[in-house]
Amino acid sequence: MRWLGIDHGDGRIGLSISDELACLAHPYQTLQSDARVLAEISRIVERERIGGIVIGLPKNMDGTLGQSASKAKAFGDELARAIPAAKIIFWDERLTTVEAQRALRAAGKNTKQSKKIIDQVAAQILLQSYLDSLQWEQRGAQ
């Protein structure tokens, strides 16, 4: 099953996508956070045959949920209504954007270049974290 990772933000939404074996996450696309975003994600889910969606839940460092997490949950609820066949998972995304910034700097990307893809890379880190947890669960069950 393929997974879609979503890094939800007020202005932009970063997307990542897994391979068909759900082993590796790849940056996919950045969308504007506007009225058309649900329809666009629905098209992507259908076109890429996505079975599950992992939405980043930006928890505070103490583990509590703040305003950004509430917005992400509300977005996930809207997405669940728009795409009822997809499994929706919320996943802790603390520090994924910081990690994405570090990775892009290490790859030699400047701030201007990074701005175009940082949300995708954050979504990739988020989704890869979830996929890794699935792999650990499967290994533990054997």
Name each model feature, range by range:
Residues R2-I6, D10-G11, S16-Q142:
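Phosphate- and other anionic-substrate recognition elements at nucleic-acid/protein interfaces
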